[in-house]
């Protein structure tokens, strides 16, 4: 994709299980579902926010751990228990008058393929299924749950020429 095309992206839709997490489902002794999120992805979220990209978490499961982590991450849109991601994305695009090329989608499995098709940019972790890898514009070298989202966002922002500016604001390191 060209820099011009990547600069159009205003929203990133991100799957949870297998993309932000390692796809494992863990339960505590009381039966509560737990998730392990990689703190490295936080830098990607914050960098995206610095350049005006809004984040939508779109997942088929509902989990209190996801709610808590996404609140900490100041995610603009948290959609859980979504059984029809395609219809949700289409409705969101219509309501907000968003064009396909203004949205990126990060996912890892078959249930993400149709959502990826609706968006102008698609990224996936290294351990995504082969069908998703074939659809992706960028395949991270990092596995889901181990910083793949940060890697994909850093790729996107580097290609747009905005990475250094974004992380400089995040970490106030003046580069």
PLM features per residue range, with description:
Residues 35, 71-73, 77-79, 86-175:
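Mg2+-dependent phosphoryl-transfer enzymes with acidic/Ser/Thr/Gly-rich catalytic loops
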Residues 2-87:
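Alpha-helical substrate-recognition element adjacent to the catalytic core
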């Amino acid at each position: 994709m060209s820099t011009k095309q990547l600069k159009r992206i205003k929203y990133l839709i991100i799957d949870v299980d297998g993309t932000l997490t390692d796809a494992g489902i863990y339960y505590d002794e009381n039966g509560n579902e737990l998730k392990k999120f990689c703190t490295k992805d936080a830098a990607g979220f914050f960098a995206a926010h610095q350049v005006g990209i809004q984040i939508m978490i779109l997942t088929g499961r509902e989990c209190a751990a996801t709610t808590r982590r996404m609140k900490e991450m100041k995610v603009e849109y948290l959609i859980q228990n979504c059984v029809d991601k395609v219809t949700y994305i289409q409705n969101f695009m219509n309501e907000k008058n968003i064009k396909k090329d203004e949205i990126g989608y990060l996912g890892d499995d078959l249930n993400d393929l149709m959502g990826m098709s609706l968006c102008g940019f698609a990224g996936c972790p290294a351990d995504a299924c082969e069908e998703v890898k074939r659809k992706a514009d960028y395949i991270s070298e990092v596995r889901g749950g181990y910083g793949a989202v940060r890697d994909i966002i850093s790729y996107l922002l580097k290609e747009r020429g905005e990475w250094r500016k974004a992380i400089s604001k995040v970490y106030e390191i003046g580069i």
